[in-house]
UniProtKB/Swiss-Prot annotation:
Keyword annotations of the record: Cytoplasm, Methyltransferase, RNA-binding, rRNA processing, S-adenosyl-L-methionine, Transferase
Any single GO CC term annotated in Swiss-Prot or TrEMBL for this entry: cytoplasm
Record has Hydrolase as a keyword: no
Protein name as annotated: Ribosomal RNA large subunit methyltransferase K/L
Organism: Idiomarina loihiensis (strain ATCC BAA-735 / DSM 15497 / L2-TR)
Gene that encodes the chain: rlmL
Superkingdom classification of source: Bacteria
Amino acid sequence: MYRFFIACSKGLEGLLFDELQEFNLSHVKQTLAGCYIEADLQQAYTVAMWSRLASRMLLQLGEKEVSSLDEIKLALTQFSWSKVFDANRTFVVDFSGGNDDIRHTQFGAQLVKDCIVDNFRNSGFERPSIDKQDPDIRIAVRVHKDKLTWSLDFTGDGMHKRGYRLQQGEAPLRETLAAAILVRAGIKNELEKDEPVIFDPFCGSGTLVIEAAMMAMDHAPGLSRAHWGFLFWHEHSPQLWHDVLEQAEQRFKEGKKNFKGHLKGSDNNPHLVAKAKDNAKRVLLHEVIEFEVADATNCEAPAESGLLVCNPPYGERLGEAVETLLLYRRFGRQLKDTFQNWHIAVLAGDEQLLKRLKLRSHKKYPLLNGAIPVNLALYDLTKEQPDFAESQADDLVNRVKKNHAKLSKWANKEGLDCWRVYDADIPEYNAAIDIYQDYVVVQEYAAPKDIPEGVANDRLWFMLESLSSALPVSEDKIILKRRQRQSGKQQYERQSQDSTVLTVNEYGAKFEVNLTDYLDTGLFMDHRLVRKELLDKCEELDVLNLFAYTCTASVQAARAGAARVVSVDMSKTYLKWGERNFALNRLRGDYQFIQADCFIWMREQRGKQLFDVIFLDPPTFSNSKRMSGTLDIQRDHVGLIKTATGMLKEDGVILFSNNRKKFRIDTEGLDKAGLEVNDQTQASIPEDFKRHKGIHHYYIISRA
């Protein structure tokens, strides 16, 4: 009898144990990430051929208690490797685990390789060669605590490699996981019917439906594999293996002939459907699986009842989040409307996505797709599903529609193609919705502390689901930004690698906005009228823009014909952005872009440069490493304004703004400094922000 460790993905140990019981083995013991078995050679070949859930099959060659590196070397060098394989065969070593002496698996693999080579040489044989790509023999060695185990990888490669998937989609589903999903979904019950029906409406490259077909037609998962790790093992029995192989071929022939059901896969990507057909052809299943190009959210049920199993897109990338969310919602409606009397299994990367189906599951299983945590949910549509009321959408949809009808006319008249259509008008839906040409950007506000996170999430998702019916926007142009507290340089870092960059128009100016890569888009729309004031009043003036961000205020001052415009900001990213904004407007003149801490720069330039207009729009709070200290605008605004006054011409003005909600300007402190404050907040708030009166504070400050 031989001792094997049959490995599987974590979470599948129980299923693997049940499967191994079917092989009439005398000993099966379940453990973490697999099972130990004892088997004779014919049983071992049978497990290798027929296990659908195992990922590897390791024949244990030896194990030993070791306490040092020397003891590891001694055990592996003294083992008779020439009894396992010939010196003229190539091999490779897979090493896992480690201890105080072996901290890196690469070092461990090299150590084992040297021991094997030394053993062959010491036994009078030639040195065997290494082949990492296509070895004849694969040796697996593990060190865990003080235990050393060495094994022959019996199958030679991952058992998920069935031989049919030479090509795959962007997010491949491992064949072993696909088989486990089908078992969890209840495929055995479906196959007991006279005419079973199995359907995957998101089939991709066909893995789930091909695995289902292999089960339905008694096609062994190992039948189409080209290479096995035991073929060059000294104890391999070609006759026994031939018998197992011949039996598998005969069972498939009979199973295919006797199958009377319907297997179908569809996908909206023609390229992937073509791959799926090719994959099915490699295992001779192309004639029994129907593939078609179709939209899963608008597909017909292929029969009155059956088993639907699918792995819809996860939408891992930021730009895909909303589109994926809405896809699940539409798919959930389609299931409820069209697949009554069906059993459903959906694999998703996120519990929130499963919630969007609006179906009640009777069972959920956490699984791993490679290293990615996923969730499998089962739904029984043969039983009545609850109605999830959607009447609450009416108030939100009506409000957004009403706002859009009113404000779109106003925006067209003003020459604007970016504006705010909704700003937490209904408190339960706590977000801002901005129009950027034909895109919609949803910015979530932080929920009150007394609102549970799950409730806030549900409300946000519900808002997103309602947008496509409330606004003239396609779902792939809805972008979600989720607010998180920013620290250090996070606010300057890219949030996504998939850019959506537009050029928008504001009172004749062109500005670059980036809807996806950063927390903000590059344009603070609530300051639109302040920028217009600069456009109207800065001709022939010297203008300083502090905390300049993407220099949109500087652009309007320059367009007004300002004699000089200086923009100062700590962020190189934003200043480069500002330079692009100037280039978009074909502005050439005395324009400077200075990367510096505004406090330090003003102290250095005090008395050297004077300006007619200083636009001062600092952040509410900042603790950037580039700053000499922290900035709290409530605490520090008097000192900041007094410092700026040192660069102000005698009859100049400071345009001071900030976005702190409960900001209170210290008129007494500024009065003592000889400064006069004119509160222009209400006049500076544009039409589309009037519902949010605390969006910013704006003051014109001059010498008394």
